[in-house]
Amino acid sequence: MAKDKTKKKNKTLKKIILAVVITLLGTLLIVAGVFLGKILKLRSDAKKIMSNVSLDSFRQTETSIIYDKNGKEISALSGIKELYYLESDEIPDVLKKMFVQIEDKDFYNHSGIDMSAIIRAALANVTHASIKQGASTITQQLAKNMFLDQSITWNRKITEMFIAMELEKRFSKDQILEFYINNIYFANGYYGIEAASEGYFG
C-alpha cells in the first residue's frame, strides 16, 4: 500500500516537472520568436533606408560656392548643412589616421561592427539595465549621423548596426572614411572638417 502511494506521488511529481519544463520551453520559444521577428523587422527597415542611398546622399546638402569670372570666390550659399565636401585624396592622410586611431582602431579589419566591442559594451549595459556604454565603429557613427536620430534605444542601435553592415557592402573603406569626415558635426552648424576649419579659423 505504501509502495503504491509512493509510486503515485512519483508519477505526479514527474508529471508536474514535465508540465513545468514544457511550459518553460514554450515560453522560451515564444520569446525567441518575438525577438527574431523584431530583429528581422529592424533588418528590413535598414535595407529600406539603404535602398535609395548613393554617393550623392553624403554630399547633397553641401555649401555651394559662387565664383566671379576670374575664379575668385564671391559668395557661399549654405545648404541645409554648412558643409564643404572634400574628396578622399583632398583629406590629409594624417587626419584620416587620427580619426581611425581615436574613433575606431579596428576600422580596416571589421565589416561595419566590432563584435568584441559590442559584447564588452553589452555586458556593461546589461549590468546597468540601460545603454551606458557604446561600441560604435566609424561606419556605425556614419549610419547614425546620416540616417537615424540620436535617441538612445535598443531598436535604434540594432538598426544602426544593420545599416553599417549594408554600408560596408556597398562602399569601400576609403569612401566610408571620406563620408564620415565630411559629415561629422562640429557645433555651430558646421558639418565636416572643412566647414569647421572655414567657420572657426576663416
Show the residue positions of the predicted features.
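Juxtamembrane regions of bacterial inner-membrane/periplasmic proteins
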Residues: A2-G202
